[in-house]
């Protein structure tokens, strides 16, 4: 068993304000996405300007925050927020949903595409590789907060988390950081470094994230108020990942089909 480091969730204070690690991780994720996007935009023939990147990141920030909070409200704590509607605005108390944030970003991308005259999937393919660093930062923030821990385990790397009882648990936040953050970024960044048919990068993101998250859910403790939703093992996270996996397969399939048709026309 490995001893949990027991971090202070407050990174530092500025007068009366407590600056928390989790909030800093969100900022770090947005800054990383912005820097990576600008590096891609500066390449010859990218079709993007740094001004467009700045606007895209601004749209995406609002999409992540609003979508993530509303998604958590609808998917995980509906009854609580119906009884306490004003608490929806208390983001500093925690409670964000990746799947809600994803929907928020998709809406933001659609609005940005309409504003700039770009196609939805042109923007989506450009954005997809930029998401993983934010996921990495967010999962590290969960680990620092000692939240969203895993199920009980007898593995040597099990940890006893504060408030999670005396038994060691999987550090599932770190599993997610490794798969949804590091592995997903490396795969998508390298995959998108070469010209790909439209929808391919977006489809790969949906397929890979959905698959990684579905797998890690087997090690992650389900939300106490939800538990398992089907067959004694299916979690809300897995249910929400299924449309991502299916959607990713469809997009990759369309991308491959369009690539073959384009190749035939040039012969």
From Swiss-Prot:
Membrane-spanning parts: 17-37, 56-76, 91-111, 120-140, 173-193, 199-219, 236-256
EC number: 2.5.1.145
Binding of a 1,2-diacyl-sn-glycero-3-phospho-(1'-sn-glycerol), residues: 139
Membrane topology type: Multi-pass membrane protein
Keywords attached to this entry: Cell inner membrane, Cell membrane, Membrane, Transferase, Transmembrane, Transmembrane helix
Protein's UniProt keywords contain Transferase: yes
InterPro entries associated with the record: Lgt
Record flagged with keyword Methyltransferase: no
GO biological process: lipoprotein biosynthetic process
Gene Ontology molecular function: phosphatidylglycerol-prolipoprotein diacylglyceryl transferase activity
Pfam name, any one: LGT
Entry GO CC: plasma membrane
Compartment(s) where it occurs, according to its Swiss-Prot or TrEMBL record: Cell inner membrane
Name of the top EC class for this enzyme: transferase
Pathway assignment: Protein modification; lipoprotein biosynthesis (diacylglyceryl transfer)
Function: Catalyzes the transfer of the diacylglyceryl group from phosphatidylglycerol to the sulfhydryl group of the N-terminal cysteine of a prolipoprotein, the first step in the formation of mature lipoproteins.
Family assignment from sequence similarity: Belongs to the Lgt family.
Listed HAMAP family: Lgt
Protein name per the record: Phosphatidylglycerol--prolipoprotein diacylglyceryl transferase
Gene: lgt
């Amino acid at each position: 068993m490995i001893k949990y480091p027991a971090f202070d969730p407050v990174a530092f204070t500025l007068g009366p304000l407590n600056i928390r690690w989790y909030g800093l991780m969100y900022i770090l994720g947005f800054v990383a996405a912005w820097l990576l996007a600008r590096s891609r935009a500066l390449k010859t023939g990218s079709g993007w300007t740094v001004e467009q990147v700045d606007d895209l990141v601004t749209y995406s920030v609002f999409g992540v925050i609003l979508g993530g909070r509303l998604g958590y409200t609808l998917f995980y704590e509906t009854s609580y927020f119906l009884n306490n509607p004003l608490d929806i605005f208390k983001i500093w108390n925690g409670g964000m949903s990746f799947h809600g944030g994803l929907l928020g970003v998709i809406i933001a991308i659609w609005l940005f595409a309409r504003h700039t005259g770009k196609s939805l999937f042109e923007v989506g393919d450009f954005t997809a590789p930029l998401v993983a660093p934010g996921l990495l930062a967010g999962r590290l923030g969960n680990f620092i907060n000692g939240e969203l821990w895993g199920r009980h385990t007898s593995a040597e790397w099990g940890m006893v988390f504060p408030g999670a009882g005396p038994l060691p648990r999987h550090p599932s936040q770190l599993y997610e950081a490794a798969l949804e953050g590091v592995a997903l970024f490396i795969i998508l960044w390298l995959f998108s470094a070469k010209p790909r048919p439209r929808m391919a990068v977006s489809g790969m993101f949906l397929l890979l994230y959905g698959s990684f998250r579905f797998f890690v859910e087997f090690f992650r403790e389900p939300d106490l108020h939800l538990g398992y939703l089907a067959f004694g093992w299916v979690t809300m996270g897995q249910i929400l990942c299924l449309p991502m996996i299916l959607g990713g397969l469809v997009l990759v399939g369309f991308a491959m089909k369009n690539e073959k048709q384009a190749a035939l026309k040039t012969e």
